[in-house]
Regions:
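Short, Asp-centered acidic motifs that coordinate Mg2+ and/or phosphate
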Residues: 28-29, 118-119, 152
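Bilobed "Venus flytrap"/periplasmic-binding protein-like clamshell domains
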Residues: 2, 35, 56-107, 124-126, ...
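Ligand-binding clefts/hinges and TM-proximal coupling segments of bilobed small-molecule sensing domains
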Residues: 85-100, 139-143, 170-197
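Extended ligand-binding regions for polar small-molecule ligands
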Residues: 1-4, 61-62, 77, 82-84, ...
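Periplasmic-binding protein-like
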Residues: 52-59, 128-171, 189-197
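Acidic, polar ligand-binding/catalytic clefts
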Residues: 7-72, 135-139, 143-146
Length: 197
């Protein structure tokens, strides 16, 4: 916001609403672990990538021996956050699975803890935060081929000037180590805040 010379206004919304708000002109920049897919590039522009992350599956610890490879999830019930790369990945790679798509990751975590889904497909960084304060859950050994995805900031289509400024800020903060520092710091804060609930 400082580099653009504008006042920062943060709006918290679910992922699907965020993308709709961006394409509808209600927000100028969306930063929420957004993967710049070819489909999304049709309706919005993206900055340079700033955060690579692997896609993982969270399961209940008691099921640790049941879900070791992707095929073990075929035909099972799998939870995802709605309108995400993880939703598309689960639909594409987990054959005959019943996909449960919910607006927020905590809702899917609750479904998993209650036994309503067998696994949760999530970004590794996000999933790691939930594992810290849910000691009954774990990452499975399931691996998705070519599952490392990168996040980028999304802007309204045709806003090349904003993309250029965002790219400058990304480069500066990658080069000086801030992204790594921020990821560590805010992951820790997320865990601390969750522990208070």
């Amino acid at each position: 916001a400082d580099e653009l010379g504008v006042k920062l206004e943060v709006q918290d919304m679910n992922f699907q609403a965020l993308l709709t708000s961006l394409t509808g002109g209600k927000v100028d920049i969306a930063i929420a672990g957004i993967n710049p897919t070819e489909e999304r590039k049709k309706s919005m522009d993206f900055s340079a990538d700033y955060l690579p992350t692997e896609q993982k599956v969270i399961i209940r610890k008691e099921d640790g021996s049941r879900y070791k490879k992707l095929e073990d999830l075929f035909g099972k019930t799998v939870g995802v956050q709605k309108s995400t790369t993880q939703e598309a990945l689960a639909k594409e790679k987990i054959k005959d699975a019943k996909i449960v798509s919910l607006a927020h990751v905590p809702e899917v975590v609750l479904e998993l803890k209650q036994g309503k889904v067998d696994g949760l497909v999530v970004e590794g960084i996000v999933g790691g935060q939930y594992l810290v304060f849910n000691d009954d859950l774990m990452f499975s050994e399931v691996e998705f081929p070519n599952s490392v995805k990168s996040s980028a900031a999304a802007v309204q289509k045709g806003n090349e000037d904003v993309v250029a400024v965002v790219n400058k800020v990304i480069k500066e903060n990658t080069d000086n180590g801030n992204f790594k520092k921020w990821t560590d710091e805010y992951s820790r804060k997320a865990v601390e805040n969750a522990d208070k609930q």
